Amino acid sequence: MSVKNSFSGVLFCLILSSWTFALAQAPSGGEPEPKAQAMPQKVVVVLAMHGEPPNDFPKDEFGRFFALHARLHYAEGADEDLHLRYAALDAKIRGWPRTAENDPFHAASQRMAEQLRETTGLEVEVGFNEFCGPTIEEAIEKAVARKAEAIIVVTPMMTPGGIHAEIQIPATVKQARERHPGLSIRYAWPFDPSEVAQFLAKRIHQESQESN
Protein backbone atom coordinates (compact mmCIF):
# COMPACT_ATOMS: atom_id res chain seq x y z
CA MET A 1 0.00 0.00 0.00
CA SER A 2 1.36 3.41 -0.91
CA VAL A 3 1.97 6.10 1.71
CA LYS A 4 -0.80 8.18 0.07
CA ASN A 5 -3.39 5.38 0.36
CA SER A 6 -2.17 4.52 3.84
CA PHE A 7 -2.64 8.13 4.95
CA SER A 8 -6.20 8.32 3.64
CA GLY A 9 -7.09 5.07 5.40
CA VAL A 10 -5.58 6.21 8.68
CA LEU A 11 -7.28 9.61 8.36
CA PHE A 12 -10.64 7.87 7.91
CA CYS A 13 -10.02 5.80 11.05
CA LEU A 14 -9.09 9.00 12.89
CA ILE A 15 -12.28 10.66 11.63
CA LEU A 16 -14.44 7.90 13.07
CA SER A 17 -12.51 7.62 16.32
CA SER A 18 -12.44 11.40 16.81
CA TRP A 19 -16.23 11.45 16.56
CA THR A 20 -16.36 9.01 19.49
CA PHE A 21 -13.59 10.89 21.33
CA ALA A 22 -15.43 14.20 20.93
CA LEU A 23 -18.54 12.70 22.48
CA ALA A 24 -16.55 11.35 25.41
CA GLN A 25 -14.83 14.69 25.99
CA ALA A 26 -17.95 16.85 25.62
CA PRO A 27 -18.42 19.04 28.73
CA SER A 28 -21.55 18.55 30.78
CA GLY A 29 -24.17 21.26 30.44
CA GLY A 30 -23.27 21.93 26.81
CA GLU A 31 -25.23 21.25 23.68
CA PRO A 32 -27.10 17.94 24.05
CA GLU A 33 -25.72 15.25 21.79
CA PRO A 34 -28.05 12.94 19.87
CA LYS A 35 -28.12 9.30 20.84
CA ALA A 36 -25.93 6.96 18.84
CA GLN A 37 -27.67 5.74 15.72
CA ALA A 38 -26.87 3.55 12.75
CA MET A 39 -25.05 5.42 9.99
CA PRO A 40 -27.66 7.24 7.86
CA GLN A 41 -28.24 6.20 4.27
CA LYS A 42 -26.35 9.14 2.81
CA VAL A 43 -23.41 10.74 4.58
CA VAL A 44 -21.43 13.54 2.95
CA VAL A 45 -18.00 14.49 4.29
CA VAL A 46 -16.80 18.09 4.32
CA LEU A 47 -13.00 18.19 4.35
CA ALA A 48 -12.09 21.47 6.07
CA MET A 49 -8.67 22.66 4.93
CA HIS A 50 -6.63 25.69 5.97
CA GLY A 51 -6.11 27.33 2.58
CA GLU A 52 -3.18 29.20 1.05
CA PRO A 53 -3.08 32.32 -1.15
CA PRO A 54 -2.18 31.79 -4.83
CA ASN A 55 1.44 32.70 -5.48
CA ASP A 56 0.55 34.74 -8.57
CA PHE A 57 -1.96 37.02 -6.85
CA PRO A 58 -0.86 40.68 -7.14
CA LYS A 59 1.46 41.41 -4.24
CA ASP A 60 0.27 44.99 -3.76
CA GLU A 61 -3.35 43.88 -3.41
CA PHE A 62 -2.34 41.12 -1.03
CA GLY A 63 -0.47 43.68 1.07
CA ARG A 64 -3.60 45.85 1.23
CA PHE A 65 -5.61 42.79 2.24
CA PHE A 66 -3.38 42.10 5.25
CA ALA A 67 -3.28 45.78 6.19
CA LEU A 68 -7.08 45.87 6.22
CA HIS A 69 -7.17 42.60 8.16
CA ALA A 70 -4.92 44.08 10.85
CA ARG A 71 -6.98 47.29 11.06
CA LEU A 72 -10.23 45.36 11.41
CA HIS A 73 -8.73 43.01 13.98
CA TYR A 74 -7.27 45.65 16.26
CA ALA A 75 -9.44 48.71 15.66
CA GLU A 76 -12.70 49.13 17.53
CA GLY A 77 -15.73 50.30 15.60
CA ALA A 78 -14.17 50.05 12.14
CA ASP A 79 -16.33 51.79 9.56
CA GLU A 80 -18.35 50.01 6.90
CA ASP A 81 -16.00 51.08 4.12
CA LEU A 82 -13.13 49.09 5.66
CA HIS A 83 -15.33 46.00 5.91
CA LEU A 84 -16.46 46.35 2.30
CA ARG A 85 -12.91 46.80 0.98
CA TYR A 86 -11.71 43.83 3.01
CA ALA A 87 -14.62 41.64 1.84
CA ALA A 88 -13.97 42.58 -1.79
CA LEU A 89 -10.29 41.62 -1.58
CA ASP A 90 -11.11 38.44 0.33
CA ALA A 91 -13.57 37.42 -2.39
CA LYS A 92 -10.99 38.21 -5.09
CA ILE A 93 -8.31 36.08 -3.39
CA ARG A 94 -10.68 33.17 -2.77
CA GLY A 95 -12.00 33.31 -6.33
CA TRP A 96 -8.58 33.48 -7.99
CA PRO A 97 -8.11 30.62 -10.51
CA ARG A 98 -6.09 27.78 -8.99
CA THR A 99 -3.59 25.46 -10.61
CA ALA A 100 -1.07 23.01 -9.22
CA GLU A 101 1.60 25.62 -10.00
CA ASN A 102 0.10 28.68 -8.31
CA ASP A 103 -1.44 26.81 -5.36
CA PRO A 104 0.12 23.40 -4.60
CA PHE A 105 -1.83 23.24 -1.32
CA HIS A 106 -5.15 23.47 -3.18
CA ALA A 107 -4.08 20.67 -5.52
CA ALA A 108 -2.98 18.52 -2.58
CA SER A 109 -6.31 19.17 -0.83
CA GLN A 110 -8.19 17.91 -3.88
CA ARG A 111 -6.01 14.79 -3.97
CA MET A 112 -6.72 14.16 -0.30
CA ALA A 113 -10.45 14.51 -0.94
CA GLU A 114 -10.24 12.01 -3.79
CA GLN A 115 -8.40 9.54 -1.57
CA LEU A 116 -11.07 9.95 1.10
CA ARG A 117 -13.76 9.24 -1.50
CA GLU A 118 -11.98 6.07 -2.58
CA THR A 119 -11.28 4.94 0.99
CA THR A 120 -14.68 5.66 2.53
CA GLY A 121 -17.03 5.31 -0.42
CA LEU A 122 -18.60 8.60 0.70
CA GLU A 123 -19.11 11.84 -1.18
CA VAL A 124 -16.60 14.52 -0.15
CA GLU A 125 -16.75 18.29 -0.47
CA VAL A 126 -13.67 20.44 0.18
CA GLY A 127 -13.90 23.78 1.97
CA PHE A 128 -11.17 26.23 2.95
CA ASN A 129 -10.87 28.26 6.10
CA GLU A 130 -9.17 31.19 4.37
CA PHE A 131 -7.55 32.45 1.16
CA CYS A 132 -9.36 29.99 -1.11
CA GLY A 133 -12.84 29.04 -2.20
CA PRO A 134 -15.18 27.47 -1.54
CA THR A 135 -15.44 28.41 2.11
CA ILE A 136 -16.24 25.71 4.66
CA GLU A 137 -19.73 27.21 4.95
CA GLU A 138 -20.16 26.93 1.18
CA ALA A 139 -18.89 23.34 1.22
CA ILE A 140 -21.49 22.45 3.87
CA GLU A 141 -24.20 24.01 1.72
CA LYS A 142 -22.98 21.95 -1.24
CA ALA A 143 -23.32 18.84 0.94
CA VAL A 144 -26.87 19.91 1.84
CA ALA A 145 -27.64 20.32 -1.87
CA ARG A 146 -26.49 16.73 -2.39
CA LYS A 147 -29.43 15.66 -0.20
CA ALA A 148 -27.17 14.54 2.62
CA GLU A 149 -28.90 12.86 5.55
CA ALA A 150 -25.84 13.58 7.69
CA ILE A 151 -22.75 15.72 7.21
CA ILE A 152 -19.43 15.02 8.90
CA VAL A 153 -16.94 17.89 8.92
CA VAL A 154 -13.34 16.78 9.37
CA THR A 155 -9.98 18.52 9.20
CA PRO A 156 -6.40 17.24 9.09
CA MET A 157 -5.53 20.02 11.57
CA MET A 158 -5.08 17.63 14.48
CA THR A 159 -3.41 19.69 17.21
CA PRO A 160 -5.70 21.25 19.85
CA GLY A 161 -5.43 24.95 20.60
CA GLY A 162 -5.34 26.30 17.05
CA ILE A 163 -7.82 29.05 16.27
CA HIS A 164 -8.98 27.42 13.04
CA ALA A 165 -9.73 23.91 14.28
CA GLU A 166 -10.83 24.81 17.80
CA ILE A 167 -12.75 28.07 17.29
CA GLN A 168 -13.50 29.03 13.70
CA ILE A 169 -14.59 25.67 12.26
CA PRO A 170 -16.84 24.85 15.26
CA ALA A 171 -18.47 28.28 14.87
CA THR A 172 -19.14 27.58 11.20
CA VAL A 173 -20.62 24.18 12.06
CA LYS A 174 -22.82 25.74 14.75
CA GLN A 175 -24.18 28.28 12.28
CA ALA A 176 -24.87 25.50 9.76
CA ARG A 177 -26.82 23.57 12.39
CA GLU A 178 -28.90 26.65 13.06
CA ARG A 179 -29.66 27.00 9.33
CA HIS A 180 -30.54 23.30 9.03
CA PRO A 181 -32.01 22.22 12.39
CA GLY A 182 -33.33 18.91 11.06
CA LEU A 183 -29.99 17.78 9.63
CA SER A 184 -27.22 16.01 11.52
CA ILE A 185 -24.05 18.07 11.07
CA ARG A 186 -21.14 16.77 13.12
CA TYR A 187 -17.57 17.97 13.55
CA ALA A 188 -15.24 14.99 13.93
CA TRP A 189 -12.79 16.70 16.24
CA PRO A 190 -10.73 16.66 18.46
CA PHE A 191 -8.61 13.67 17.59
CA ASP A 192 -7.56 11.18 20.24
CA PRO A 193 -3.92 12.19 20.94
CA SER A 194 -2.87 8.56 21.39
CA GLU A 195 -4.13 7.67 17.91
CA VAL A 196 -2.41 10.68 16.36
CA ALA A 197 0.79 9.55 18.09
CA GLN A 198 0.33 6.04 16.68
CA PHE A 199 -0.09 7.46 13.18
CA LEU A 200 3.07 9.57 13.54
CA ALA A 201 4.95 6.61 15.02
CA LYS A 202 3.99 4.53 11.99
CA ARG A 203 5.41 7.19 9.65
CA ILE A 204 8.57 7.41 11.76
CA HIS A 205 8.96 3.63 11.50
CA GLN A 206 8.42 3.71 7.72
CA GLU A 207 11.01 6.46 7.33
CA SER A 208 13.56 4.66 9.49
CA GLN A 209 13.06 1.46 7.47
CA GLU A 210 13.53 3.31 4.18
CA SER A 211 16.72 4.97 5.41
CA ASN A 212 18.33 1.63 6.29
PLM feature spans:
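Bacterial N-terminal signal peptides that target proteins for export
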Residues: 2-10
